[in-house]
């Protein structure tokens, strides 16, 4: 009894991570079909596969699928759980397939116990290959997950770069505004310093003027009155002295009143001046505050200058690098230009040679035409002379062309005719 067994099992699947999708569906083995015949006929055992979509339906791209919305870690965990459940189903189906194969082998052993064949080696090879396929699929899934993680990292870095670029632009705008503010504060500080200096000078002048006024109105302690009396007729000396004393007392009282009035006025003025130093101190406090602000702005300005110098260094490095590349490109272009110039010279030389050869060809064609006419004329003369029984002997000629070239260029061409004697 002859029997044939053919086993076909073609599971195939492709796994993709968050950035990809399921390629083609996994094919699961189903129950084998057995065709047999009575009376020792051939038995054919075949396994067919059916397509079974992966659990959870078909998956599209990672960005358009609803499964990938939300947190990326939760999505990847969900995908890993689905993959694990899918592999468990595959193992369960493989175990069911093995059970069916064992039942079929038992059935064949019962039908044909004499023709027992050992398929253990093939089964081991199949099992080993199936394990390799599963390992390859797992490795493929891990690689795709790594690729998706790398893509997500690249997207994050691009987003960070865009944010840093926008932040840099904002800082540049803010630095420009701070520079304008610094210029305005410098102008205001200069004006305030000039105003304070003017007020100090005015205060010094007022003090000097006050001292001068005090010196003018000051009555010295050794004030003496010198009285000179002319010796004239004798008058009442006591009465005259009394009148003079009263007059000078009136003058002294008037001076005292004037001094009191002037003192009160100067006291009021000094009280006002005493109040003005508070204003000066407040302005000095403002000046100190402006100086601190100015120092802070100078620090920020130095920081921005350092950033600017770093960017200028980067720009110079980039320019030097691209200048080197440009120089290389210019060298390549100059090399190709030299080759093009040589090619043009070569074409000109070939064109000159072609013109010379064309002239020689034209000259030869003219000579051939002339010889043809001469030959035709000689043939007619030969016919006439044949009638008169005259013999004509033709003398053949050999044309020798001599060409002289220097450095590949044709400089001389001669055509010589040599008669060939019979």
From Swiss-Prot:
InterPro entries associated with the record: IF_conserved, IF_rod_dom, Keratin_I
Matches recorded under Pfam families: Filament
Residue segments, region Linker 12: 218-240
Domain of life: Eukaryota
Residue ranges, annotated region (Coil 1A): 72-107
Regions of compositional bias (Polar residues) in chain numbering: 1-13
Start and end residues of each stretch annotated as Coil 1B: 126-217
Region (Disordered): 1-73
SUPFAM superfamilies the UniProt entry points to: Intermediate filament protein, coiled coil region
Region spans: Linker 1: 108-125
Region Coil 2, annotated ranges: 241-378
An example Gene Ontology CC term for this record: intermediate filament
Chain ranges passing through the membrane: none
Gene Ontology biological-process annotations: epithelial cell differentiation; intermediate filament organization
MF-aspect GO terms: structural molecule activity
Segments of this protein annotated with the region Rod-like helical tail: 379-422
Note: There are two types of cytoskeletal and microfibrillar keratin: I (acidic; 40-55 kDa) and II (neutral to basic; 56-70 kDa).
Protein's UniProt name: Keratin, type I cytoskeletal 23
UniProt organism field: Homo sapiens (Human)
């Amino acid at each position: 009894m002859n029997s044939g067994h053919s086993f076909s099992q073609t599971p195939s699947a492709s796994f993709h991570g968050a950035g990809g999708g399921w390629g083609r569906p996994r094919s699961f083995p189903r129950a084998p079909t057995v065709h047999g015949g009575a009376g020792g006929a051939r038995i054919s055992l075949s396994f067919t596969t059916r397509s079974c979509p992966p659990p959870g339906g078909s998956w599209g791209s990672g960005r358009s699928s609803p499964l990938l919305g939300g947190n990326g870690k939760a999505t990847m965990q969900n995908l890993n759980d689905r993959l694990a459940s899918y592999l468990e189903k595959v193992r369960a189906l493989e175990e069911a397939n093995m059970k069916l194969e064992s039942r079929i082998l038992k059935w064949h052993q019962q039908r044909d116990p004499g023709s027992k064949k050992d398929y253990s080696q093939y089964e081991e090879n199949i099992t080993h290959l199936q394990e390799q396929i599963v390992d390859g699929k797992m490795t493929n899934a891990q690689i795709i997950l790594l690729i998706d993680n790398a893509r997500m990292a690249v997207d994050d870095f691009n987003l960070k770069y865009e944010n840093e670029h926008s932040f840099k632009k904002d800082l540049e705008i803010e630095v420009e505004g701070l520079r304008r503010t610094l210029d305005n504060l410098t102008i205001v500080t200069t004006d305030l310093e000039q105003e304070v200096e003017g007020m100090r000078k005015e205060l010094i002048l007022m003090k000097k003027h006050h001292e001068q006024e005090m010196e003018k109105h000051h009555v010295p302690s050794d004030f003496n009155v010198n009285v000179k009396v002319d010796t004239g007729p004798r008058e009442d000396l006591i009465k005259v002295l009394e009148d003079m004393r009263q007059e000078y007392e009136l003058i002294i009282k008037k001076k005292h009143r004037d001094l009191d009035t002037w003192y009160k006025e100067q006291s009021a003025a000094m009280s006002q001046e005493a109040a003005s130093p508070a204003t000066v101190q407040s302005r000095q406090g403002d000046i100190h505050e402006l100086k601190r602000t100015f120092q802070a702005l100078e620090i920020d300005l130095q920081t921005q200058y350092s950033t600017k110098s770093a960017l200028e260094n980067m720009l110079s490095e980039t320019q030097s690098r691209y200048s080197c590349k440009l120089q290389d490109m210019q060298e390549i272009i100059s090399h190709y230009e030299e080759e093009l110039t040589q090619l043009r010279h070569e074409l000109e030389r070939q064109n000159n040679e072609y013109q010379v050869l064309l002239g020689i060809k034209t000259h030869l064609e003219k000579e051939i035409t002339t010889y043809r006419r001469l030959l035709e004329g000689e043939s007619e003369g030969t016919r006439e002379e044949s009638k008169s029984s005259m013999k004509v002997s033709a003398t053949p000629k050999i044309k020798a062309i001599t060409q002289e070239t220097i450095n590949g260029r044709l400089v001389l061409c001669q055509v010589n005719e040599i008669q060939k004697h019979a």
